[in-house]
């Protein structure tokens, strides 16, 4: 299992200003990233005669495709938040100064969901990426059975019927 899959919790990050080399690699290790609209990015190891070894070669290709990854890894060109968004390196771009508030708002919306369902969903997405869709699909029924028999699933249905926000317990 990768380190990403070993984490149970969703990691969200926010970036602002200059995000070069290891900054990009740390950012790409997060599940959800919010960037300020004034960010500058560059993966510049090749300018220093070395290779990016903190995960950029893997995660850039995973998120943006081989050609886009190689374009930025091999040229060390600087790019902005709009390009990072286009490449799926960041999931939201907000005006500078609002990135922390937006990241916290996303974290609060995730925290309001059923904890076991959040973990199961996140792990299934990562399994599909790392082991293929068939492996992820194979987990659908057994994982759904566990979740459907939980107190949180019962609370989710009750809350839907009663038209109120659910109060999940993690059980």
Kindly give the residue locations of the regions a language model identified.
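C-terminal long alpha-helix characteristic of the crotonase
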Residues: 34-39, 81, 90-138, 146-151, ...
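Short alpha-helical scaffolding segments that buttress acidic/His motifs in well-ordered protein cores
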Residues: 72-73, 121-125, 144, 160
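Short, basic/aromatic-enriched C-terminal tail that caps enzymatic domains
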Residues: 156-171
């Amino acid at each position: 299992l990768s380190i990403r899959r070993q984490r149970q919790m969703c990691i969200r990050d926010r970036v602002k200003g200059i995000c070069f080399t290891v900054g990009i690699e740390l950012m790409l290790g997060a599940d959800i990233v919010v960037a300020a609209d004034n960010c500058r990015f560059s993966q510049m190891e090749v300018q220093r005669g070395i290779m990016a070894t903190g995960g950029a070669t893997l995660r850039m290709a995973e998120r943006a495709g081989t050609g886009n990854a190689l374009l930025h890894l091999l040229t060390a060109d600087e790019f902005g938040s709009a390009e990072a968004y286009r490449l799926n390196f960041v999931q939201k771009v907000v005006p500078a100064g609002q990135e922390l508030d937006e990241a916290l708002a996303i974290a609060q919306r995730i925290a309001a969901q059923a904890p076991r369902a959040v973990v199961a969903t996140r792990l299934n997405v990562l399994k599909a990426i790392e082991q293929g869709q068939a492996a992820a699909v194979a987990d659908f029924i057994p994982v759904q059975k566990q979740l459907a028999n939980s107190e949180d699933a019962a609370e989710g249905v009750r809350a839907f019927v009663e038209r109120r926000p659910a109060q999940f317990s993690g059980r």
